[in-house]
């Protein structure tokens, strides 16, 4: 991979986008960004607070702006928020400005990986987490698939193994 293409990780919460993204960036000697962390940095508040105060629409507007700015950079790995693909603009920008890698996982793995995480605003509701995750999957999985250049299942693999798979797939394309 002589020239460094942007690599954008999409997928549901708990798929490993941030962990795998950091590993991938380290292995490729690229800059890593996480859209949720960028929002937190810019607002001085955590994602849950932004969600509570501004609602999902306000949060998504911030997310769209942050992703637009970040995707204009060169040679980065970006872990996007699970719902970022709801925006057609964001989907178009991701597709046009880099390689989109869809990190796929099962509802069971999502439940296991997110059960103690209080920084997941969409799971801080009355409905059972499984039902919430299933509804999100029904809405978002087709959007991830629509823009994915590469799809990798992350269920029982370490971040390093998945990062190596991504590198191998990128080198063979």
Swiss-Prot record:
Pfam families: SKI (PF01202). The keyword Amino-acid biosynthesis applies. CDD domains: SK. Binds 1 Mg(2+) ion per subunit. Keywords: Amino-acid biosynthesis, Aromatic amino acid biosynthesis, ATP-binding, Cytoplasm, Kinase, Magnesium, Metal-binding, Nucleotide-binding, Transferase. Pathway: Metabolic intermediate biosynthesis; chorismate biosynthesis; chorismate from D-erythrose 4-phosphate and phosphoenolpyruvate: step 5/7. It is found in: Cytoplasm. Its main location: cytoplasm. Monomer. Catalyzes the specific phosphorylation of the 3-hydroxyl group of shikimic acid using ATP as a cosubstrate. Belongs to the shikimate kinase family. This is Shikimate kinase 1. It comes from Salmonella typhimurium (strain LT2 / SGSC1412 / ATCC 700720). The gene is aroK.
């Amino acid at each position: 991979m002589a020239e460094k293409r942007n690599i954008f990780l999409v997928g549901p919460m708990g798929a490993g986008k941030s962990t795998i993204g950091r590993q991938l960036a380290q292995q490729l000697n690229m800059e890593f960004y996480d859209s949720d962390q960028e929002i937190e940095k810019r607002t001085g508040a955590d994602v849950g607070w932004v969600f509570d105060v501004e609602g999902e629409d306000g949060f998504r507007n911030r997310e769209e702006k942050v992703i637009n700015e970040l995707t204009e950079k060169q040679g980065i790995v970006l872990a996007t928020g699970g719902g970022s693909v709801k925006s057609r603009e964001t989907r178009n920008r991701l597709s046009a400005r880099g390689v989109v890698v869809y990190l796929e996982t099962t509802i069971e793995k999502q439940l296991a990986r997110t059960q103690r995480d209080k920084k997941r605003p969409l799971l801080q509701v009355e409905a059972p987490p499984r039902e919430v995750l299933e509804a999100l999957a029904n809405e978002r999985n087709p959007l991830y698939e629509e823009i994915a250049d590469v799809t990798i299942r992350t269920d029982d693999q370490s971040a390093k193994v998945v990062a190596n798979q991504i590198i191998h797939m990128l080198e063979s394309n």
